[in-house]
Amino acid sequence: MQKNLLLGVEAIAQGAIDGGISGVYAYPGTPSTEITEYIQVNPEAVTRNIHRSWSVNEKTAYEAALGMSYAGKRSLVCMKHVGLNVAADPFMNSCVTGVHGGLVLAVADAPSMHSSQNEQDSRYYA
């Protein structure tokens, strides 16, 4: 395997591609935006026909990724920490229903409100 020097968000995106995702869904919000942008322009993602989609909000992004997982496909959903609050309803319900194909939720917190209107530790959702 070829070694590449990647930024953190690029490594997350490349790991998802290498892990066999069939789709990535996101709502733009720094610092999570760059994960989806990397997948959108990655030649390997295009060759593998990975579905790449921006959603109208975090809830619909999560629901679309969850639907892909219910269909037996692997998916990735990306959002910033305040977006997880928007997606909380389907997120908490999916903890009960489970997933089938695999679902990775990439939530980017902003310590010290670096790029957000508030500070939140999303690990409390765990």
Regions found by a protein language model. Give the residues of each.
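Thiamine diphosphate
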Residues: 1-126
